């Protein structure tokens, strides 16, 4: 089921404690563009189908990445793309956006998403891995 634009941004805004909808939208656009570069095939399409159309298009037409970024490098890349951001604020942005995307995706799809990402992304999505299970 697709989440509506306003509901998605309202959740990101609340979780990120942003003062304006524009701040929440900026974070969502950057984080999902970077995430899209790490997902392929049906998993990316399935996640996009659960997002508002504007954000789905960003996920489906991502920034290019030569190789998958570790979670730490993902945070640094996010900070570089958001004007005035630090790694600390970027981590906050990532958590607000990816936890909202994870809620929209549901557990089964999130498991597939995390299988395509380097280890450690589970915490960025707010879904710590179960010990003994990948990722």
Would you name each region that the model predicts?
Residues 1-38, 95, 99:
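The feature marks the first
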Residues 17, 29, 87-90, 94-95, ...:
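A domain-level signal for the structural core that forms small-molecule/cofactor-binding pockets
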Residues 18, 22, 38-42, 84, ...:
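Residues at alpha-helix boundaries and the short loops/turns that link adjacent helices
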Residues 37-70, 105-135:
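Extended intrinsically disordered, low-complexity coil regions enriched in Ser, Thr, Gly, Ala
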Residues 57-108:
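Short, solvent-exposed interaction modules
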